[in-house]
Curated annotation (Swiss-Prot):
Keywords: Cytoplasm, Lyase, Phenylalanine catabolism, Phenylpropanoid metabolism
Family, per entry: Belongs to the PAL/histidase family.
Function as written in the Swiss-Prot or TrEMBL entry: This is a key enzyme of plant metabolism catalyzing the first reaction in the biosynthesis from L-phenylalanine of a wide variety of natural products based on the phenylpropane skeleton.
Statement: the UniProt record of this protein carries the keyword Repeat: no
Major localisation: cytoplasm
Sites bearing 2,3-didehydroalanine (Ser), chain numbering: 195
Record has Transferase as a keyword: no
Active site: 100 (proton donor/acceptor)
Binding residues annotated for (E)-cinnamate, in chain numbering: 252, 340, 346, 376, 448, 476, 479
Database matches in Gene3D superfamilies: Fumarase/aspartase (Central domain), Fumarase/aspartase (N-terminal domain), Phenylalanine ammonia-lyase 1, domain 3
Subcellular location: Cytoplasm
Protein's name in the database: Phenylalanine ammonia-lyase
Length: 708
């Protein structure tokens, strides 16, 4: 990440190429979104994070939030630059220069003056310690420790750049706290991210200065006082007595909002890729038509997010067994389903593409923010002046988080629409209602409860999509009359990510159930087909005297009925006269009998006379064969293996079934849907889903299939 320039080198700012940074912003979006997510994952797993003031990315703050292995790094120029701004503050005060936050009050009361710079910084930290933790109430009002650690990292990164007037020793102390996994306790609420995240950051400053109300949490979750935290972290020399401007440098920045935003966006990017792959699996289990991914369609629309989403789905579906089987099905009976798939499938690239673009743009915006110098005033040593501006305004955070949250809600809406089709036997092309897998559908209601839960998740997610940034209130005696609400928006986006994880986990469980049901369907249909074929040969081929019988010509049409009839429409009682299979098999024989003409008058050539024998033998044999096929699957010896192994989506299925140890849900077993969904959700939260997700796409070359 380029952007910050060394203090004291003004010529570096007078650049003629890309002076407005638009080119740099555009360059950051080169390459595929998937490649960027892969880089995020690689950097997340990097055992060390180097802090240099300009090189932090939104891909690299999540690791330090979760681990205790950050390491500091700085170029030879950084300490000199940093100390020069610190010296400049002291010299200007000693020379009687009037500087905001050094000799003046703060905000709307900056008309006040003092020469006691040390006491002023001490008072700043005291009055900003305005947060509520709710100790003893049973409810936590403490910022998640991961977000606090991300904030510490981002604040160090900002202050390293040398425009804030703070000593290196203070930054070194914060780094030691990070490296020893010691986390200050910050209030969850109380910041508007306008003059930065003043209130929460003041608690980090409070720990550094040894305020008696400051608390921290140790590596094992133990509560620590400031003194215990310093001792455990190996910070020498006791608590810091802040010099002029140092308190302001610590609290006047956007680190809490941007730190949390970077964590949120890491997960949002992964969930975006997951939604693309889940949409492709949806096409597989729904017998969809893969032409919706054809590159020409999307190239003509021009949007890169859409083009990439379609290309990823196209890659998953390419050579998929399910797509080959669906193509044969559509060719055999083109009227069995609509000519075009419904929008939740057919327009999924068009729907997901803009959401991916929004999330990617937000990621870059936050990346720029966490590398920015965002306090006030800024010390320009080269021009011997303090610049009073507003880089502490966290609008990039509020806007990017609002936009990301809306994108996440849209992804969730698509997932819900697809899920609703999947569990509905009017739309799911032959799967059972509620994805029930038991023998008796009257005692197995499958995913009915799950669908209710999904509606709840989706409703909450849609509510969370409402913007935060349009609820600004004027604050601090109308000095902070517009404010970004960046951390609030980041917190709400973190909630949205959690809800989308619930939806994605639940949906993945449902898709795995559908895959197993397609496997069961194929084996049951194979058993029915073989049985009908054998019974037809035994009862319809020969007459009573051993001669060839006219009914032998019914066999092909009987098998066509089996091929076209949804097996789960009759599987619980395959010989029931109330179910379509037996009705249509009988109708085939009746139709042939009506065409048999004068031969029907002869008992030895009558097809009508054969119907009873055919049905009686089928009733005697078919239920046993259907049960045998089902039992073979349950015992691990199916006649036909699960075709998912022939698909690029197999790694996700394998992860859910083998690594997590789950199986097809049925009312015949005690395991509830929630137990399985909980397992998958935990794996998603732990990052376990990432490797199988990327495994599905490991052979994708980053381009759509050629159209010519």
């Amino acid at each position: 990440m380029e952007g910050a320039i060394a203090n004291g080198h003004t010529n570096d700012f007078c650049i003629k190429v890309d002076p407005l940074n638009w080119e740099m912003a555009a360059d950051s979006l080169k390459g595929s979104h998937l490649d960027e997510v892969k880089r995020m994952v690689a950097e997340f797993r990097n055992p060390a994070v180097k802090i240099g003031g300009q090189t932090l990315t939104s891909l690299r703050s999540p690791p330090i939030a979760a681990r205790d292995n950050a390491s500091k790094w700085s170029s030879p120029r950084l300490p000199a630059r940093r100390e020069s701004s610190s010296d400049w503050v002291m010299n200007s005060m000693n020379n009687g220069t009037d500087s905001y936050g050094v000799t003046t009050g703060f905000g709307a009361t900056s008309h006040r003056r003092t020469k006691n710079g040390h006491a002023l910084q001490q008072e700043l930290i005291r009055f900003l310690n305005a947060g509520i933790f709710g100790t003893g109430t049973g409810a936590s009002h403490t910022l998640p420790h991961s977000a606090t650690r991300a904030a510490m990292l981002v604040r160090i990164n900002t202050l390293l750049q040398g425009y804030s007037g703070i000593r290196f020793e203070i930054l070194e102390a914060i780094t030691k706290l990070l490296n020893h996994n010691i986390t200050p306790c910050l209030p969850l609420r109380g910041t508007i991210t306008a003059s930065g995240d003043l209130v929460p950051l003041s608690y980090i400053a409070g720990l550094l200065t040894g305020r008696p109300n400051s608390k921290a949490v140790g590596p094992n979750g133990e509560a620590l006082t400031a003194e215990e935290a310093f001792k455990l972290a190996g910070v020498q020399g006791g608590f810091f007595e802040l010099q002029p401007k140092e308190g302001l440098a610590l609290v006047n920045g956007t680190a809490v909002g941007s730190g949390m935003a970077s964590m949120v966006l890491f997960e949002a990017n992964v969930l975006a890729v997951l939604s693309e792959v889940l949409s492709a699996i949806f096409a597989e289990v729904m017998n969809g038509k893969p032409e919706f991914t054809d590159h020409l369609t999307h190239k003509l629309k021009h949007h890169p997010g859409q083009i990439e989403a379609a290309a990823i789905m196209e890659h998953i579906l390419d050579r998929s067994y399910y797509m080959k089987a669906a193509q044969k099905l559509h060719e055999m009976d083109p009227l069995q389903k609509p000519k075009q798939d419904r929008y939740a499938l057919r327009t999924s690239p068009q729907w997901l593409g803009p959401q991916i673009e929004v999330i990617r743009q937000a990621t870059k915006m936050i990346e720029r923010e966490i590398n920015s110098v965002n306090d006030n005033p800024l010390i320009d040593v080269s021009r011997n002046k303090a610049l009073h501006g507003g880089n502490f305004q966290g609008t990039p955070i509020g806007v990017s988080m609002d936009n990301s949250r809306l994108a996440l809600a849209s992804i969730g809406k698509l997932i819900f629409a697809q899920f609703s089709e999947l569990v509905n036997d009017y739309y799911n092309n032959g799967l059972p209602s509620n994805l029930t897998a038991g023998r008796n559908p009257s005692l197995d209601y499958g995913f009915k409860g799950v669908e209710i839960a999904m509606a709840s998740y989706c409703s909450e997610l849609q509510f969370l999509a409402n913007p935060v940034t349009n609820h600004v209130q004027s604050a601090e005696q109308h000095n902070q009359d517009v404010n970004s609400l960046g951390l609030i928006s980041a917190r709400k986006t973190a909630e949205a990510v959690d809800v989308l994880k619930l939806m994605s986990s639940t949906y993945l469980v449902a898709l795995c159930q559908a895959i197993d049901l397609r496997h069961l369907e194929e084996n049951l249909k194979n058993a029915v087909r073989n049985t009908v074929n054998q019974v037809a040969k035994r009862t319809l081929t020969m007459g009573v005297n051993g001669e060839l019988h006219p009914s032998r010509f019914c066999e092909k049409d009987l098998l066509r009925v089996v091929d076209r009839e949804y097996v789960f429409a009759y599987a619980d009682d395959p010989c029931s006269a109330n179910y379509p299979l037996f009705q249509k098999l009988r109708q085939v024989l009746v139709d042939h009998a009506l065409q048999n003409g004068e031969h029907e008058k002869n008992v030895s050539t009558s097809i009508f006379q054969k119907i009873a024998a055919f049905e009686d033998e089928l009733k005697a044999v078919l239920p046993k064969e259907v049960e045998g096929a089902r039992s073979a699957i349950e015992n691990g010896n199916p006649a036909i293996p699960n075709r998912i192994t022939e698909c690029r989506s197999y790694p996700l299925y394998k992860f859910v079934r083998e690594e997590l140890g789950t199986e097809m849900l049925t009312g015949e077993k005690v395991k509830s849907p929630g137990e399985v969904c909980d397992k998958v959700f935990t794996a998603v939260c732990d990052g376990g889903i990432i490797d199988p997700l990327l495994e599905c796409l490991k052979s994708w070359d980053g381009a759509p299939l050629p159209i010519c």
